[in-house]
């Protein structure tokens, strides 16, 4: 029996996911072909597999979303068998992103810290659903000069760091050249701190970080008109991540509020883990 493996398409929706960390592979067992996934990321991943079979059948429906735990060596995806004698083959496409895309519930009541040091104040140059680049996106842009220390708004696990880009522009090519740090939270949400400096990360993938911890240095990389910190808290999705509006402690920390465009917010409190 000859099995022809054809890879039609495989792509990563989240650019930080490494093809060295996510591997789909096949093994022969008792005359069957078993497809497995290896996940060496520090985050669970959502994986959608679509198979095209010729003279083969799958034990279960192959078009399925799988939630693969972090640091998994061998997660069974599909079991394929030949239908009759003769040439047989399979091809596949897949999508993969950080986190659990089936998750709909998160901690609505969690209060975030402002993502900078005590005593500093910065304004929001573009708010939730901003008219410039935040249409239908719940993200915030802090007017932050290059070289400013960025602190974690919430504790969690670092799941991605990109810091090798050094340029900025308004061309399409620069949309994928923003440096950033991604931190996953206990409730399944993920925070994205973008446009950090070249080599500006102060944490590494796999690190556990506390609220208020220094995580990066702000910069001006990627698709920008000037230096700023782009912050978004989101739940993952294959086509588009679901940005969330979250509240922050402001002033001396007694007030929790949604941040508004063109307003300045001072952080006069120390972060509490």
Regions found by a protein language model. Name each.
Residues 1-22, 37:
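Bacterial Sec-dependent N-terminal signal peptides
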Residues 36-43:
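Asparagine-centered strand-capping/turn motif at beta-strand->loop junctions
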Residues 43-51, 152:
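Short, hydrophobic/aromatic beta-strand segments
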Residues 54-63:
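Short beta-strand and strand-turn-strand segments in soluble, beta-rich domains
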Residues 67-177, 270-273:
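Surface-exposed, glycine-biased beta-strand/turn segments
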Residues 110-116, 125, 171, 202-210, ...:
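Acidic, glycine-rich catalytic/binding loops that coordinate metals and/or anionic ligands
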Residues 145, 188-212:
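Short histidine-centered loop motifs in beta-beta connectors
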Residues 150-160, 202-218:
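Short, well-structured beta-strand-loop connectors
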């Amino acid at each position: 029996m000859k099995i022809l493996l054809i890879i039609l398409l495989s792509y990563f929706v989240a650019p930080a996911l490494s093809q060295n960390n996510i591997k789909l592979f096949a093994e022969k067992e008792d005359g069957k072909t078993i497809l497995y996934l290896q996940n060496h990321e520090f985050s669970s991943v959502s994986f959608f597999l679509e198979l095209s079979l010729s003279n083969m059948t799958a034990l279960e429906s192959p078009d399925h979303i799988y939630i693969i735990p972090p640091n998994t060596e061998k997660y069974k995806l599909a079991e394929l068998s030949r239908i009759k004698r003769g040439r047989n083959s399979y091809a596949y496409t897949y999508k993969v992103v950080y986190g659990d895309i089936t998750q709909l519930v998160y901690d609505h009541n969690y209060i975030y810290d402002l993502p900078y040091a005590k005593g500093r104040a910065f304004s929001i140059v573009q708010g939730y659903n901003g008219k410039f680049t935040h249409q239908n996106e719940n993200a915030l842009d802090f007017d932050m000069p290059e070289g400013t220390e960025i602190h974690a708004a919430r504790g969690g696990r670092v799941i991605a760091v990109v810091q090798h880009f050094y340029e900025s522009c308004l061309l399409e090519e620069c949309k994928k050249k923003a440096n950033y740090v991604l931190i996953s939270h206990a409730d399944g949400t993920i925070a994205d701190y973008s446009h950090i400096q070249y080599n500006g990360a102060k944490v590494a993938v796999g690190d556990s970080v506390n609220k208020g911890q220094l995580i990066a240095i702000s910069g001006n990389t990627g698709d920008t008109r000037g230096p700023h910190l782009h912050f978004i808290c989101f739940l993952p999705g294959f086509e588009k991540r679901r940005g969330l509006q979250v509240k922050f402690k402001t002033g001396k920390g007694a007030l929790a509020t949604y941040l508004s465009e063109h307003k300045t917010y001072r952080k006069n409190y120390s972060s509490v883990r």
